[in-house]
Amino acid sequence: MSIDLRDIGYRIAQNDHSALKALYDHFSNSFYQLALAIVHSAELAEEIVEDVFIQVWKKRTRVAEIENLQLYLYVTTRNISRSYLRKYKNKNFINFDDVQLPYYKIEV
Protein backbone atom coordinates (compact mmCIF):
# COMPACT_ATOMS: atom_id res chain seq x y z
CA MET A 1 0.00 0.00 0.00
CA SER A 2 1.35 3.38 -0.95
CA ILE A 3 0.50 6.68 0.71
CA ASP A 4 1.06 10.24 -0.40
CA LEU A 5 3.57 11.46 2.18
CA ARG A 6 3.38 15.08 1.08
CA ASP A 7 -0.41 15.05 1.61
CA ILE A 8 0.01 13.26 4.95
CA GLY A 9 2.55 15.90 6.02
CA TYR A 10 0.21 18.76 5.13
CA ARG A 11 -2.69 17.11 6.94
CA ILE A 12 -0.61 16.48 10.07
CA ALA A 13 0.47 20.13 10.01
CA GLN A 14 -3.24 21.00 10.06
CA ASN A 15 -3.83 18.90 13.23
CA ASP A 16 -5.35 15.93 11.39
CA HIS A 17 -5.17 12.98 13.81
CA SER A 18 -6.26 10.54 11.11
CA ALA A 19 -3.24 11.54 9.01
CA LEU A 20 -0.92 10.75 11.92
CA LYS A 21 -2.67 7.39 12.36
CA ALA A 22 -2.26 6.65 8.64
CA LEU A 23 1.44 7.49 8.90
CA TYR A 24 1.78 5.31 12.00
CA ASP A 25 -0.08 2.40 10.41
CA HIS A 26 2.10 2.61 7.32
CA PHE A 27 5.53 2.88 8.98
CA SER A 28 5.34 1.66 12.57
CA ASN A 29 6.31 -1.95 11.82
CA SER A 30 9.31 -0.96 9.69
CA PHE A 31 10.58 1.45 12.31
CA TYR A 32 9.92 -1.06 15.08
CA GLN A 33 12.19 -3.51 13.23
CA LEU A 34 14.87 -0.83 12.89
CA ALA A 35 14.69 0.11 16.57
CA LEU A 36 14.73 -3.57 17.58
CA ALA A 37 17.86 -4.17 15.51
CA ILE A 38 19.58 -1.33 17.36
CA VAL A 39 18.42 -1.79 20.97
CA HIS A 40 17.75 -5.56 21.00
CA SER A 41 14.71 -5.15 23.25
CA ALA A 42 11.13 -5.49 22.08
CA GLU A 43 9.84 -3.30 24.89
CA LEU A 44 12.32 -0.51 24.19
CA ALA A 45 11.69 -0.76 20.45
CA GLU A 46 7.96 -0.27 21.02
CA GLU A 47 8.65 2.73 23.23
CA ILE A 48 11.01 4.21 20.65
CA VAL A 49 8.42 3.96 17.87
CA GLU A 50 5.87 5.65 20.12
CA ASP A 51 8.40 8.40 20.84
CA VAL A 52 9.03 8.92 17.12
CA PHE A 53 5.37 9.53 16.39
CA ILE A 54 4.91 11.64 19.51
CA GLN A 55 7.78 13.79 18.27
CA VAL A 56 6.13 14.08 14.84
CA TRP A 57 2.94 15.27 16.50
CA LYS A 58 4.78 17.75 18.72
CA LYS A 59 6.51 19.20 15.65
CA ARG A 60 3.45 18.90 13.43
CA THR A 61 3.45 22.54 12.36
CA ARG A 62 6.77 21.91 10.57
CA VAL A 63 6.04 18.44 9.17
CA ALA A 64 4.76 19.83 5.85
CA GLU A 65 8.16 21.48 5.32
CA ILE A 66 10.04 18.16 5.52
CA GLU A 67 11.24 17.26 2.03
CA ASN A 68 11.53 13.49 2.61
CA LEU A 69 9.25 12.42 5.45
CA GLN A 70 10.20 8.75 5.25
CA LEU A 71 13.90 9.57 5.58
CA TYR A 72 13.12 11.98 8.43
CA LEU A 73 11.25 9.21 10.29
CA TYR A 74 14.07 6.73 9.63
CA VAL A 75 16.74 9.12 10.96
CA THR A 76 14.56 10.05 13.95
CA THR A 77 14.04 6.37 14.80
CA ARG A 78 17.77 5.71 14.52
CA ASN A 79 18.68 8.72 16.65
CA ILE A 80 16.15 7.98 19.37
CA SER A 81 17.31 4.34 19.40
CA ARG A 82 20.91 5.43 19.87
CA SER A 83 19.81 7.83 22.60
CA TYR A 84 18.10 4.95 24.41
CA LEU A 85 21.27 2.88 24.10
CA ARG A 86 23.30 5.64 25.76
CA LYS A 87 20.67 6.14 28.43
CA TYR A 88 20.30 2.45 29.28
CA LYS A 89 23.83 1.29 28.41
CA ASN A 90 24.68 0.00 31.88
CA LYS A 91 21.20 -1.10 32.88
CA ASN A 92 20.11 -4.72 32.96
CA PHE A 93 16.52 -5.43 31.99
CA ILE A 94 14.45 -8.47 32.71
CA ASN A 95 11.34 -9.21 30.73
CA PHE A 96 8.51 -9.35 33.25
CA ASP A 97 7.00 -12.34 31.43
CA ASP A 98 10.20 -14.32 32.11
CA VAL A 99 10.15 -13.77 35.87
CA GLN A 100 9.08 -16.76 37.92
CA LEU A 101 6.84 -15.56 40.68
CA PRO A 102 6.09 -17.75 43.67
CA TYR A 103 2.72 -19.41 43.66
CA TYR A 104 0.67 -19.13 46.81
CA LYS A 105 -2.48 -21.09 47.34
CA ILE A 106 -5.07 -19.12 49.22
CA GLU A 107 -7.88 -20.96 50.86
CA VAL A 108 -11.08 -19.17 51.56
Regions found by a protein language model. Give the residues of each.
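N-terminal module of bacterial RNA polymerase sigma factors
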Residues: 1-30
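Residue-level signature of the cytosolic catalytic core of signaling kinases
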Residues: 1, 65-66
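Internal acidic/polar
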Residues: 2-5, 91-108
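Short, charged helix-capping/linker segments at alpha-helix termini
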Residues: 13-21, 33-51
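Structural recognition of an alpha-helix C-terminal capping motif at a helix-to-coil junction
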Residues: 33, 47-54, 58, 67-79
